[in-house]
Design a protein with these regions (language model features):
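N-terminal membrane-anchoring alpha-helices
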Residues: 1-21
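Conserved acidic catalytic loop of the alpha/beta-hydrolase fold
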Residues: 85-103
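Conserved donor sugar-nucleotide recognition element shared by glycan-biosynthetic enzymes
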Residues: 82-87, 111
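Conserved HGGG/HGGXW glycine-rich cap/lid loop of the alpha/beta-hydrolase fold
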Residues: 34-74
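A short loop-to-beta-strand scaffold at the N-terminal edge of the catalytic core in hydrolase folds
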Residues: 25-35
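Flexible "cap/lid" loop of the alpha/beta hydrolase fold
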Residues: 128-159
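Conserved hydrolase catalytic core segment
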Residues: 100-140
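Alpha/beta-hydrolase
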Residues: 148-150, 156-220
Length: 220
């Protein structure tokens, strides 16, 4: 298993570098993905853990801009640890990209910084969308500690098994809200996208600073 694993990891890390762009702002270097940005831009704020690769597809009438939040992949944690500071990073990025207004979507652990962006910069916010967003503080769970401290190879094996689950079990493991699970299961394409999202937490070693910071921000 070790040789295929190391080959796969090398390819993943190479692709992560290849598929992203970076902008030097007054908040530091911010990694992002956003091609063909137009007048209708969705600022997609990824969850915990995640990165610019945890995103959604552009639509017919809108493009998608996904930054890596501080501590994830190519954005240094020093750019901003609190949700307020991360919102300031997003503001710095859209200013450099000459974007006046964006729709903001906060997913999971990206919810707090998305909400702060909308509150702090209403002049730059066309709308706010929240999906399974963190909206209150809570303490670590045992499974959270295990994820934060996981080795890349152990998580690789775990995710490989997870993506072999039946659709219902897989959805239940990822989405607490029953209505959201039902909508996801109604479309086979959604299951394929969910499996893609699951792998966007790997390799965890490139996202560990971000998830540790998130939990420090979110716990009681």
């Amino acid at each position: 298993i070790y040789i295929p694993y190391f080959v796969y990891k090398t390819l993943v890390l190479w692709k992560l570098r290849l598929d992203s762009s970076a902008m030097i702002t007054h908040r530091g270097r911010i990694e992002y993905r956003g091609n063909g940005l137009n007048d209708n831009v969705l600022l997609y704020v990824h969850g915990s853990p995640g990165g610019y690769d945890q995103t959604t597809d552009p639509g017919k009438n809108y493009s998608v801009l996904t930054p890596s939040r501080p501590g994830y992949l190519g954005t240094d944690i020093l750019s901003g640890s609190s949700p307020e500071a991360q919102a300031a990073c997003f503001k710095a990025l859209i200013d450099e990209l000459k974007l006046d207004k964006v729709f903001v979507m906060g997913v999971s652990g990206g919810g707090p910084s998305a909400m702060h962006f909308a509150a702090q910069y209403p002049q730059n916010t066309s709308g706010l969308i929240l999906f399974e967003a963190v909206s209150y503080s809570e303490n670590f769970l045992e499974k959270d500690e295990a994820l934060i401290n996981a080795r890349d190879i152990d998580l690789f094996i775990q995710l490989s098994f997870m993506t072999c689950f039946g659709s219902k079990k897989l959805a239940a493991s990822m989405l607490p809200n029953k209505n959201n699970r039902a909508r996801l299961l109604a479309n086979k394409r959604n299951i394929r996208l969910l499996k893609k999202v699951i792998w966007s937490i790997w390799p965890i070693s490139r996202r560990r600073s971000g998830i540790k910071n998130d939990y420090n921000q979110f716990i009681n």
